[in-house]
């Protein structure tokens, strides 16, 4: 279906007009019907008159402007330059281009949610691939438009649900395709999530191998945020495998720690016998906002660490078990699997202490890649 035929149809219905009322003096009813159903391409003059009657503005200048804007947007998207894409579109009134075919591109590029399914018949392959990504159907997006960006989105989606093998395959493909085309930001993001995927499986050598590439790329791009991110993830992985002193050195030297980095510092201090320093970190964290995760969940995670510090016999307290289980369930529901994996040792510790061996085994089966 032709998009402009679709928009004429939708706008006519929105005004509760008949076909005869809209096309009077412009064209025949049968011709309008064919235009609306995509069976006929209207002449420029007929299209202009129909749109004008519907109070929709479209001329060659507007259409060219919209097309150029959309193509620049697609280039930014497929290059992974999302900040530049946002800057490009946020200053534009996309509804100004509503009567142009490029409105679909601009709306998809700026949307956080999928468009109405009824409009999919008007979409080309590229647009439909973006629609599928917004719908959470990344596999279908890859089938429609197999490029570095769609493979990256597929890899990230698989990573978030803990499907690490398929995630690694998609992310490696994304990196390879991006490297051929010089899409550095896609290369960077693919390597970040490759490192994350191996880190969540406690495969530290492979995590560090991918993060080393990330480090080189990020330094070249002067991307301090990414350099912090891989440092944070590396130190968090050290906690998971018991390298508490190394993790402590990294978290304790941060000049501007976040709430979650203070949470990790408190755990390092807990594990290395620095109780007072752990409490200081918790006190500071509790006064901060959480940018990384939901604030109420972050406070619950801090409460868990404080409980263990306040009560050395915490494994005999039902209150601790209830708080732990609530936090773990929220982590599984609300966040990528890595957050739950990080807290898995405390869950298993609780189940074993309370002789809930069946639940401990079920949890181990749910996270088979976790080494304890």
Positions of the model-derived regions?
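Amphipathic alpha-helical segments of tetratricopeptide repeats
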Residues: 90-95, 139-140, 172-183, 212-222, ...
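Structural motif corresponding to the intra-repeat A-B loop/turn of tetratricopeptide repeats
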Residues: 79, 161, 201, 221, ...
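Short alpha-helical DNA-recognition segment
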Residues: 15-34
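A short, Lys/Arg-rich alpha-helix, primarily the initiator
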Residues: 1-14
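DNA major-groove recognition helix of helix-turn-helix/homeodomain DNA-binding modules
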Residues: 43-61
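Residue register of alpha-helical TPR repeats
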Residues: 67, 105, 130, 149, ...
């Amino acid at each position: 279906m032709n998009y402009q035929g679709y928009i004429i149809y939708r706008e006519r219905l929105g005004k509760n007009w008949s076909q005869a009322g809209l096309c009077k003096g412009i064209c025949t009813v049968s011709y309008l019907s064919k235009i609306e159903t995509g069976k006929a391409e209207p002449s420029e003059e007929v299209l202009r008159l129909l749109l004008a009657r519907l109070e929709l503005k479209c001329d060659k200048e507007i259409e060219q402007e919209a097309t150029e804007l959309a193509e620049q947007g697609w280039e930014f998207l497929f290059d992974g330059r999302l900040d530049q894409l946002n800057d490009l579109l946020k200053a534009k009134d996309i509804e100004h281009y509503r009567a142009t075919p490029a409105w679909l591109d601009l709306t998809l590029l700026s949307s956080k949610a999928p468009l109405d399914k009824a409009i999919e018949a008007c979409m080309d392959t590229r647009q439909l691939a973006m629609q599928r990504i917004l719908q959470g159907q990344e596999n279908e997006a890859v089938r429609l438009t197999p490029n570095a960006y769609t493979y990256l989105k597929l890899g990230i989606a698989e990573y978030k649900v803990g499907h690490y093998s398929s995630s690694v395959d998609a992310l490696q493909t994304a990196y390879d395709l991006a490297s051929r085309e010089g899409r550095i930001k896609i290369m960077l993001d693919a390597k970040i999530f490759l490192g994350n995927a191996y880190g969540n499986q406690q495969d530290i050598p492979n995590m560090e191998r991918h993060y080393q590439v990330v480090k080189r790329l990020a330094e070249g791009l002067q991307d301090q945020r990414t350099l912090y991110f891989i440092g944070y993830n590396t130190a968090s992985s050290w906690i998971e495998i018991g390298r508490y002193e190394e993790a402590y050195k990294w978290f304790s030297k941060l000049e501007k720690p976040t709430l979650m980095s203070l949470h990790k510092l408190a755990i390092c201090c807990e594990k290395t016998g620095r109780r007072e320093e752990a409490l200081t970190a918790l006190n500071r964290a509790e006064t901060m906002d959480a940018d990384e995760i939901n604030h109420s969940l972050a406070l619950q995670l801090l409460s868990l660490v404080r409980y263990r510090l306040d009560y050395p016999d915490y494994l005999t307290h039902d209150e601790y078990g209830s708080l732990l289980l609530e936090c773990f369930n929220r982590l599984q529901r609300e966040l990528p699997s890595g957050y739950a994996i990080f807290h898995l040792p405390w869950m298993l510790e609780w189940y074993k202490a309370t002789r809930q061996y069946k639940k401990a085994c079920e949890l181990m089966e749910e996270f088979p890649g976790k080494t304890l």
